[in-house]
Design a protein with these regions (language model features):
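Charged, compositionally biased N-terminal leader segments and the immediate start
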Residues: 1-28
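A short, surface-exposed helix-loop junction/capping segment
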Residues: 28-37
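Short acidic (Asp/Glu) and glycine-rich catalytic loops that position anionic groups and cofactors
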Residues: 31-32, 50-54, 319-328
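Low-complexity, Ser/Thr/Pro/Gly-rich disordered linker/stalk regions
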Residues: 39-41
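Conserved ATP-binding subdomain of kinase catalytic cores across diverse folds
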Residues: 44-47, 53-65, 71-255, 259, ...
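Catalytic activation segment of kinase domains across protein kinase-like and atypical kinase folds
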Residues: 201-204, 284-289, 293-331
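Phosphate/ATP-binding catalytic cores across multiple sugar-kinase/actin-like superfamilies
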Residues: 271-282
Length: 331
């Protein structure tokens, strides 16, 4: 399966991969924010899906894919990145959150890991944003593997993803872009015959996700709840600088707040507005996320973490797409 986009956009993309590990570099002084991890590789992986539109965001096209198929398999099916003679270790980030209205404590990337980030060739529209959104994008794109094995944040899970749900995420996220709904992107999907035990025995898969950032509400909650105040201030400064620079221009006014509090208030308002706009767009196409816990909500207004999502065929305000949501909290 190949998801295609504008051929002119795709053919223009010929840049090789130039990796950085931006998250680890940003939080080098705050090791509590992440852990170095190693992927659980897929045995005899098969590339099942590839999105030309997502690939163009990082300067790749289908010809590039065929020419460097082995290298891409090492990256996206095995989590092994070689760059400038060095092996880059993926990272899993720590966050916390409220799940179904209840404080869940420390969470984190339990079955996902950040390979690193790459130079961006994406426009706002490539993420589903309109020109009127005035979204500010950084010049890097984060690359994340989902289903890549256990991390220190996996709790009791195996860190794997099954093929069935991975196909849903791949198709769902790329479809949302086509509908004009801000979303993470799915670059590619690898499957294998490795068994994964759920209600029944299924097979393992890894989907590669792209985003301007995977930062979520839960990152803020983690730093705040566990009193990592210096890390929190550092985190908010980085977030504002890269994605909400207008918030940093907030200055002293008659409210009595100092400049530091003013920029944080401006940042909060911007995030709330972006989130409200996203949910309105979901409603406009009948999209139901299903698990709107704070660890699944993006700080820049992207649809992230496609789990038991669905679409309404006809309007039903009581529809619950997540069978685990027994009280219908996210109907």
């Amino acid at each position: 399966v190949k998801i295609e986009s504008d051929p002119a956009h795709v053919e223009a993309a010929t840049t090789p991969l130039h990796w950085k590990q931006g998250f680890a570099e940003d939080f080098a002084d705050f090791p509590v924010a992440y852990r170095r991890v190693k992927a659980t590789v897929l045995q005899e992986p098969r590339r099942l899906c590839w999105s030309d539109g997502a690939a163009a965001c990082i300067g790749l096209n289908s010809k590039h894919l065929e020419r460097h198929a082995h290298d891409f398999e090492s990256c996206f099916a095995q989590g092994q990145v070689e760059y400038l003679g060095q092996t880059l270790a993926p990272v899993a980030s720590a966050y916390a959150g409220h799940q179904f209205g209840v404080w869940a404590g420390q969470l984190g990337d339990g079955r996902a890991m950040l390979l690193g980030d790459l130079p961006s060739q994406a426009s706002a529209g490539d993420w589903g944003f309109d020109a009127i959104d005035s979204i500010h994008l950084s010049d890097r794109i984060e690359v994340q593997l989902k289903g890549s094995g256990q991390t220190p944040y996996s709790r009791m899970g195996d860190g794997r993803a099954v093929l069935r749900s991975s196909i849903r995420e791949f198709l769902g996220s790329e479809a949302m872009i086509g509908l004009g709904i801000p979303s993470t992107r799915a670059l590619c999907l690898y499957g294998s015959d490795d068994p994964v035990f759920r209600e029944t025995t299924e097979t393992a898969a890894i989907v590669t996700r792209l985003a301007p950032t995977f930062l979520r509400f839960g990152h803020v909650e983690f730093f705040a709840h566990f009193h990592h105040h210096d890390a929190l201030n550092h985190f908010l400064q980085k977030l504002a600088k890269r994605h909400y620079p207008k918030a940093l221009s907030a200055r002293h006014d008659a409210s009595g707040l100092n400049d530091d509090d003013l920029y944080k208030l401006a940042l909060f308002k911007s995030i709330a507005s972006r989130t409200g706009d996203l949910i309105a767009r979901w409603q406009s196409v009948g999209f139901c996320h299903g698990v709107m816990n704070t660890d699944n909500m993006s700080l820049i207004g992207l649809t992230i973490d496609y789990g038991p999502f669905g679409f309404l065929d006809q309007y039903d305000e009581d529809h619950v797409c997540n069978h685990s949501d027994h009280q219908g909290r996210y109907s």
